[in-house]
Each structure stands twice: as C-alpha cells, then as structure tokens.
C-alpha cells in the first residue's frame, strides 16, 4: 500500500511519492497505545453549599459509588476534601481526583468563603511548577492534581444568583474552567427553570464573568458544542436509586406525584452535562487547564522569581536561559564540593603520613634501644660465663692440689 503525502506544504519542501509501504502510518496507533498504557488523569472540583447534591451528582456521572463522608453545617470555615480513585473502562485507565467543598456558604460572614478554594487551585499549580523547575524532573511519574474543571453548584432558588456565587465565579474565572450547574433542578417547574437559566446567564454576562464555553473551532464537535453551549447552566438531577421502566433499568428520583428520570433529556440536563464533560470535551478541559490557566499562573510566578519578557528575549527563552545558568551554577558548586573533598582527603592523607612517620621513628628508636639492651645483656652473659669458667678452673686446681697433699701424707 502506498502512503499518501500531504500537499499543503511550503514551496521549498519537496513532495515525494513513496514507492512502497514504509510504516510511519502506524504513528497514530503508537501514540494511542502509549497513552492507553500510561493512563489519563482528570480532576474535578465541586463547589457548592452543604447538602446541595455534589456527591450524588458525581456518583451518577461516573456510575460509581464513592466513599464520601457526609458534611455538616458546623464548620467555622469552609474546607476541601480530595479523594483519588483509579477507574478503568474498556482498558482505558483513569486516575480521577474528586475535590469537594465542606461547609461552603454555611457561615454568617461569607466574604472569604471562596479563599480556600482559590488557595487549593493555586497550590496544585505550584506543586506542578516546582516539579517542572527541578533539575531532575519526572513529569510522567508525577501525579498531576491540577483542577481541570470546576462544577459550580447553584441553589435552585428560581430567583437570581446569590452575591456569594457572583464573587466566587469571578475569582475562579481565570484559574479554572468553571461550568455552572443548577442543582436539584427538579424542585422548580419547567417555566421557572427557563426563566432562572436566562436570569443566571444575564447576571453572568452583566458582571463579565468568564465561564467555560465548549469549543466550536473543531469541525468534528463544533455543531454539538454550539447547541450544548445554549443549555448552560445545566439543570441537573442526581440519584443512586434505580427502577425498571418498560423493562429498562433507569436512575430516578421518586416523588408522590411521579418520578424524574435522571437520564431523560426531557426531565433534566444530566445527559447533556455528561456528554459534554466526559465524552466530548474532557481532553479540551485538560488542554485548556495546562495551556491557559496553568500558563497564566506559571508566567506570574516566573515574573515574581525574576523572569521577565523583553523585546530581545521571550519569557520562555528567559526561563530556559535562567534554568541553564542554574544548571551551570549547580555544576560549579558540585565541582567546588568535589575539589574541597579532594583537598580534605589530601590533608587527611598528609596527617596519616605524618603519624606513620612518627610511629616509624618511635619504632626505630625502640628497636635501637632493644638492640643495645640485648648487646649489654649478651656482654654480661659472656662475662658471667667467663667468670664461671675461671671459677671451674680454680676449683679443679684446688681439687688437684688437695689430692696431691693427701697422696704425700700417705707415703710418709
């Protein structure tokens, strides 16, 4: 099979027709296989009042029972809890991190309710940045906890957005992809819901709040996303209760007057949210988090560290240059430490040699003293042996003289 060559090339690039199969047409398959083997990461932040249905909606979205501990209304300050799960669907692995607010909106003074949320998002950006700045970094092994999407839960009042909602979404707009959802939308009528949606969009636009819009520049999904953008904010219902209707198991919320089917688009926008969030635009959320929100944070932090854009050099070039300087400084420090270590080793060797010489001198002195003492003892021994020999000779002479005297006496 002959590979096709793209024709949209600059004029100075030659177009060649392959005479046979080469094999680089398998590159997309290689990328897909590599991505599947590594798995994917997706992090969701749910911001909303206590008991508004955050946990239930997440469990409905992923058709999975999560171990969420219930929150209470007694917290003095809002807190966040994050739980990570490893999910698998058709050999595709997903490391899902779910972050929920606890005690959000329960305080009398709600002025700083959103601060812990903003701090959490910034902390995840900072963790990723510090990993990037390491001399020996391993981004593939690093667990990326940057928030890819924030589902902002709006209470179904049917009137308008609360001031806390406007302030919160305004502070989050440049840090995370914000998707507003109307929680427990089955508690208001259809006509009220449509008016409520229109009022929410009007207030968001009048306050110039930037919420996430599904991208329409990709021809493959532009039509679908354009239609779905008109349904924002999504009116959702979550439920873990399942019943059989016409022989089919469906998730519902049952009331004395009837039931609401979670996955019925005539009843709520849950299916639309799931389609847009997980099945169509998950990768765009991930890319936008990295390419827009994280880059904004990264640029600001690098400027704080002393990296600045100028006419001659871009921020990225400045960053790379400063990183290269840091690498050289580190190498220089390593060389200085090595030289210092070598010098200390030499000094220690010199001390050991001096001590060895002193020991050798003492050994030679003791050896000489020992030889002299030995010589003296040998001389004393020789002198004593000579005295003993002389004594033996005198003794023999005396004995001979005594024998001679005895012989003469007998003869007389």
UniProtKB/Swiss-Prot annotation:
Q: Segment G4 motif: which positions?
A: 183-186
Provide one Gene Ontology biological process annotation: protein homooligomerization
Keywords on this record? Coiled coil, Cytoplasm, Cytoskeleton, Glycoprotein, GTP-binding, Magnesium, Metal-binding, Nucleotide-binding
Temperature notes read: Temperature-sensitive. Stable at 15 degrees Celsius. Starts to aggregate at 37 degrees Celsius.
Q: Please provide one cellular component term from the Gene Ontology annotations of this protein.
A: septin complex
The cofactor note from the UniProt entry for this protein is: Mg(2+) is essential for the GTP-binding, but GDP-binding does not require a metal cofactor.
Localisation: Cytoplasm, Cytoskeleton
What does the annotation say about its assembly with partners?
Septins polymerize into heterooligomeric protein complexes that form filaments, and can associate with cellular membranes, actin filaments and microtubules. Homodimer. Homooligomerizes. Forms (via GTP-binding domain) heterodimers with SEPT5 (via GTP-binding domain) in a nucleotide-dependent manner with GTP promoting heterodimerization most efficiently. Component of the filamentous forming heterocomplex composed of SEPT10, SEPT5 and SEPT7.2. Heterocomplex formation and the filamentous polymerization of the complexes is enhanced by forchlorfenuron (FCF), a synthetic phenylurea cytokinin.
What's this protein's function?
A: Filament-forming GTP-binding protein. Lacks GTPase activity, which is likely due to absence of an essential threonine residue important for hydrolytic activity in septins. May be involved in membrane remodeling, potentially by its nucleotide-dependent cellular membrane association/dissociation ability. Able to bind to phosphatidylinositol-4,5-bisphosphate (PIP2)-containing giant unilamellar vesicles (GUVs), which serve as a model of biological membranes. Self-assembles into ordered cage-like structures on the vesicle membrane.
Protein name from the UniProt record: Septin-10
Q: Which organism is it from?
A: Schistosoma mansoni (Blood fluke)
Lineage start: Eukaryota, Metazoa, Spiralia, Lophotrochozoa, Platyhelminthes
């Amino acid at each position: 099979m002959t590979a096709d060559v793209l024709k949209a090339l600059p004029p100075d690039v030659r177009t060649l027709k392959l005479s046979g199969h080469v094999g680089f047409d398998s590159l997309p398959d290689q990328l897909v296989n590599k991505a599947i083997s590594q798995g994917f990461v997706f992090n969701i932040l749910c911001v909303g009042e206590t008991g508004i249905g955050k946990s239930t909606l997440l469990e409905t979205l992923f058709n999975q029972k999560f171990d969420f501990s219930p929150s209470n209304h007694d917290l003095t300050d809002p807190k966040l809890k994050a739980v990570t799960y490893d999910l698998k669907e058709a050999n595709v692995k997903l490391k899902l991190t779910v972050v929920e607010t606890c005690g959000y909106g329960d305080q009398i003074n709600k002025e700083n309710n959103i601060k812990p949320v903003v701090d959490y998002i910034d902390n995840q950006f900072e963790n990723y940045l510090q990993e990037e700045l390491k001399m020996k970094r391993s981004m593939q092994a690093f667990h990326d906890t940057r928030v890819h999407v924030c589902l902002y839960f709006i209470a179904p009042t049917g009137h308008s957005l609360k001031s806390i909602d406007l302030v919160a979404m305004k502070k989050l707009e440049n840090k995370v992809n914000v998707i507003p959802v109307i929680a427990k939308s089955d508690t208001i009528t259809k006509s009220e819901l449509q008016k409520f949606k229109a009022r929410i969009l009007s207030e968001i636009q009048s306050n110039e709040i930037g919420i996430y819009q599904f991208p329409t520049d990709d021809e493959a999904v532009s039509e679908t996303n354009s239609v779905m953008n008109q349904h924002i904010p999504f009116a959702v219902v979550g439920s873990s209760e399942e019943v059989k209707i016409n022989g089919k198991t469906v998730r519902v919320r049952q009331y004395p007057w009837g039931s609401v089917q979670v996955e019925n688009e005539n009843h709520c926008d849950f299916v639309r949210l799931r389609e847009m969030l997980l099945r169509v635009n998950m990768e765009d959320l991930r890319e936008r988090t990295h390419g827009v929100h994280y880059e904004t944070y990264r640029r600001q932090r690098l400027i704080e560290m002393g990296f600045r854009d100028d006419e001659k050099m871009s921020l990225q070039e400045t960053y790379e240059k400063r990183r290269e300087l840091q690498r050289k400084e580190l190498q220089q420090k390593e060389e200085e430490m090595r030289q210092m270590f070598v010098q200390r080793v030499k000094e220690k060797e010199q001390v050991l040699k001096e001590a060895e010489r002193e020991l050798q001198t003492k050994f030679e002195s003791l050896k000489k003293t020992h030889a002299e003492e030995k010589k003296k003892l040998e001389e004393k021994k020789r002198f004593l042996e000579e005295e003993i020999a002389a004594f033996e000779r005198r003794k023999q002479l005396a004995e001979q003289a005594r024998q001679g005297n005895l012989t003469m006496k007998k003869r007389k």
